[in-house]
């Protein structure tokens, strides 16, 4: 099975030891980005995963490419050119202080990319699945056009398409997001959202839910999933459910709605003590794609995806370093965290 993901791979700069930006003297250097994170997860699970983007040909661009190669991601379809690698600064939250993300992505290679930079017919030869997120079209209208061309080509090649809505208010307005994502979602088969994105992008929300007070009405998300599926004719809708008690402690679960069977499956809920939550949603997406490609049932798929994401919250950095066996062990009920000897 081969999966292609498309998006921006950025430099991640982060203060050490939960320091704030204003007190930090040093920053930790790594790489990450929503769709790249999904590709790493899938490569770790043994699938043929390729990441498509545009990166400069200089040393930082090459370091970004190498960060994917080391985990087995196919980087052969990355276009090289431009001058900048996008940057995001991440200040990790602690206790009641939430994390802060500051973007420095203007004029990055992918933000300035043009549709002619990518040969989607060639890229989708022999591909089974295509994944992108709502973060990528938020980079500009030219990138919306690239995403549209990718989706049209994927459909022409019989490729399944998944999209994580991933609304980012620092990149575009709700009105801009709704216009672009309404057009793009017409091509999507599997939609991934969270407790906020459906409301932010499409104005669809669950009743009796207070995301900031840690109160979620899980049953209300059946209606959210149904409305999304009806609007865009999705085959499946997954919604992750995060109960945020503090920066360290979250409740984490998800629901997967299968339209054909009219089946709503809820995962077990995990009580997380978080090491790093960045990439948590991407690891859910990677787990879900893996599950659907390998024939898991709706219940098995949502359990695997949530377990994969729960484990990612214990790992520093954007990328999820877990194996299929480790995820299946947790999904099967072993969450003791006991030492392996």
Where are these predicted regions, by residue range?
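Conserved N-terminal subdomain of the carbohydrate kinase-like
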Residues: 48-137, 327-341
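Positively charged, low-complexity intrinsically disordered leader regions
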Residues: 1-20
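Alpha-helix C-terminal capping segments
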Residues: 30, 38-48, 291-294
